[in-house]
């Protein structure tokens, strides 16, 4: 298990910067969205999906998914209902 705690991703990283075309866009996720994104991506990595960040082999799939979220390279989008 990596030394990253659940709180380190759920509690502190509220904004993620992603490229949309040539623009750098700031995405704000709720803690529930972040948990779902990281969990889904960790499952994909555990099932053999390619890793999108530099991995030195020390991190487990959850740690890799957290690093991908911090880097803003996770290929998962969030669709919200319009209020």
Swiss-Prot record:
The keyword Transcription applies. GO terms for cellular component: cytoplasm; DNA-directed RNA polymerase complex. GO terms for biological process: transcription by RNA polymerase I; transcription by RNA polymerase II; tRNA transcription by RNA polymerase III. Its EC number is 2.7.7.6. GO terms for molecular function: DNA binding; DNA-directed RNA polymerase activity. It comes from the Archaea. Its main location: cytoplasm. Part of the RNA polymerase complex. Belongs to the archaeal Rpo6/eukaryotic RPB6 RNA polymerase subunit family. DNA-dependent RNA polymerase (RNAP) catalyzes the transcription of DNA into RNA using the four ribonucleoside triphosphates as substrates. This is DNA-directed RNA polymerase subunit Rpo6. It comes from Methanosarcina mazei (strain ATCC BAA-159 / DSM 3647 / Goe1 / Go1 / JCM 11833 / OCM 88).
